[in-house]
């Protein structure tokens, strides 16, 4: 444990090392259980990138040189290493008293964002990001105050109001709760102590931009089409799969829980103890289509051996 993470992962951007003090975090002992096994990462589909035409050149170091059906494949070994570092960063920040805001407004991220934020007593945004959440704090705090007042009135069944007024207030409260429930705790957290964990920096570009403006550190998933410089520390992985996002965000939440003496659900657990959600049918069809396309392409071009064809629960040969 004497080596440093910067010695373990040569591809870490110097900017990331400087901003997040990676050099202070001890590297994993290679004889220990990996944070997540390579097999589990493959099962989660973290290796699926986007079409080569959509890639971002700064992600080149995290991609396999050979493309499949003109689609980039993310190197799962580098995903594993970067996830390990991200875990230790989050754990370290949590130990120092940092607070976290989970952000994931795309369909595939909503459920895990809410579950893991609630589990770790963190702030979250899984619905629409309200412009100014971080940069126009006064307006957001004012809305939170309004919501709190309405909740108090609701507890008393809106006593003193007519039926029509009650319905109007109930409707107003429901709308505020839908947009603000996840950020209730924002009023008690100084922004300088926040760390943002984001599922898709492109989908939630406004949130990322506001965090940047306020000097909030950002850790997020960086798919093959994402500029990794959008975040302070990126985890190269598929950001369009429910399984992939669930795996990564549960591990990050494990880091927060561990710092507080809580239980780890996925991090450093055996494969049989890691149960991933079933992908929605649309996602499943897309995954099967990609796998079939990769297999057909490989056989036509003779670029892969049969054992290297991408199938569920098989390893990728770099």
UniProtKB/Swiss-Prot annotation:
A single cellular component GO annotation: cytosolic small ribosomal subunit
Highest taxon in the source lineage: Bacteria
Gene Ontology biological-process annotations: translation
Record key words, sorted: Ribonucleoprotein, Ribosomal protein
GO molecular function, a single term: structural constituent of ribosome
InterPro entries to which the protein is assigned, alphabetical: Ribosomal_uS2 (IPR001865), Ribosomal_uS2_bac/mit/plastid (IPR005706), Ribosomal_uS2_flav_dom_sf (IPR023591)
Pfam families hit by this protein: Ribosomal_S2
Family of this protein: Belongs to the universal ribosomal protein uS2 family.
Name of the featured protein: Small ribosomal subunit protein uS2
Gene name for this UniProt entry: rpsB
